[in-house]
């Protein structure tokens, strides 16, 4: 069962899957709306009886200094990139618990959900929230036999920029995003750090099968992640050296 706000793209995806012999169905879904995501869940359980993997993948991008970010910009990013996954949990989790057996919930976050980036304030806030949601949920639902994974890629070949422009509606007013920065985020230089969707999907499936919480496709992210946690750890020593004893 696929959900997408873009009906044409949804129809194309369903057609491609059916051509490969997959029993695919699609429901138009705006993840900003809990009713839409709940309807998607209704249809998934109606058609298939059970659901074993839920993939919260919808996302948009925003770039620009925080001081230049409007309230509507904040709402737009948080509504899609954070409320979307929350709505996915609200709509599917109670039913996964009720059906029993093993199942898995996957969230797409970002490298920006682990390491903050200048000029990506709202995006980082949302993606950090997704990581926290996944980490907390993983601990809570483990006794229910439900696994959780959070995908934190750096750069993947997707239609991120086009999706952002298409999804933003008049409800959020004119965009204040730095178009050039978003373009760089969505269409980075062609080098070894850019992964294709198929490779990332394969790694994600492996994480589901292994019940692995973190999915980290880019080895280049490792040093940055280590430095961040080293800085946090050193703070305890710095404070102790200054006389803090608690």
Segments the model singles out, each with a brief description of its role:
Residues 1-12:
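Conserved glycine-rich Rossmann-like NAD(P)H-binding loop of the short-chain dehydrogenase/reductase
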Residues 7-8, 27-39, 71:
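The beta1-alpha1 cofactor-binding region of Rossmann-like NAD(H)/NADP(H)-dependent oxidoreductases
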Residues 65-66, 73-75:
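Substrate-binding pocket helix/loop in short-chain dehydrogenase/reductase
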Residues 89, 126:
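Active-site helix of classical SDR
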Residues 110:
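Residue(s) in the substrate-gating loop at a strand-loop-helix junction
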Residues 115, 136-146:
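Active-site-adjacent segment of SDR/Rossmann-fold oxidoreductases
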Residues 143-215:
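SDR active-site lid
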